[in-house]
């Protein structure tokens, strides 16, 4: 006899990413997956005739587990990518999806691909595209409108076809998305984009923005199945009583905590870490620091990390992930791992350079540099100084404190990815692994 599961029964054991230590098996119930799936249906992820989803995240990842639950329970079609994320744009051209879920790095590739196409246009066409984009951006900022009766069919159709021509909804998560990139893609592709936030422990659906919200830089509010609170973090000077220094408006800040039916049942065979993660009142402590934007409907903005912080010699706290998210916008930086030794007073970093921009700079030194040999120059001090200079300029623009500026850098010939276990499938750096892998290099940077 088949016995149907109860809401509290375990549906899946989903392992955490391992960015802060060993992966832990989060026990996710049927009820948690069901209620979070229902939340997804209220984000714009609603199905119409002819919809299709492009799947590329690994099914061991909680986000894809959640989306598959939504798709399969509704009998909805989806296509699976070819297996190489570098070919994702080509896969989209073939499948012609209407829905996508991705991390910011993937959307950054789309953004760069569109700009590469625009760059190849003649003067007149390039001006037409620029005018169309600017007018649509203006309309979106004023009225929240993504489509245009003239520009879309006559000018922007080839751009829209870069991802198949039918995309209408994109969900982004895992890391903050550049507001400029987000709004550009919204109007260039005539597609809604929402930002989500969550962890394996809360079934990936803790907080999500609305598709009609044209203000970037936040992650929206709680899914209706969740309670959210902010916990004071005295060590980092974050308090729920904080106020905006300029306006005096209440601007609470603190560690984001969540509870509700979407919460996991605990870590498999790991009562110690379960008790560390969930307090006696049932609140899961995320390790992320949030700020409530009281002037914008109490939307939440991620501003820092409680976990993964460390102290330098003078006692200053450093949140490396916050710095990395900004430094990856540097024109030479594809990936970056920021590291600090508590016995030193400055930061160092391992950088995976961007191929195109790095080659362009190296050609000013040696005209024979090409795609096949550019990595041979990664020990060149002139290149390192150029990258450090660009990173410092970017940091200053983003209000880096003096001790947050990277002083020395190593250029890595290999990327951080799941294959070498230096990153998760969503490209979050596994800090313990990266520290171990680059230990000698990091030590040498400090000993130079």
Model-derived segments and their meaning:
Residues 34-52, 59-155, 166, 188:
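Conserved AMP-binding/adenylation subdomain of ANL enzymes
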Residues 61, 105, 167, 173-181, ...:
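Conserved A3 ("GATE") glycine/threonine-rich loop of ANL adenylate-forming enzymes
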Residues 16, 236-239, 246-312:
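Conserved ATP-binding/catalytic segment of the ANL
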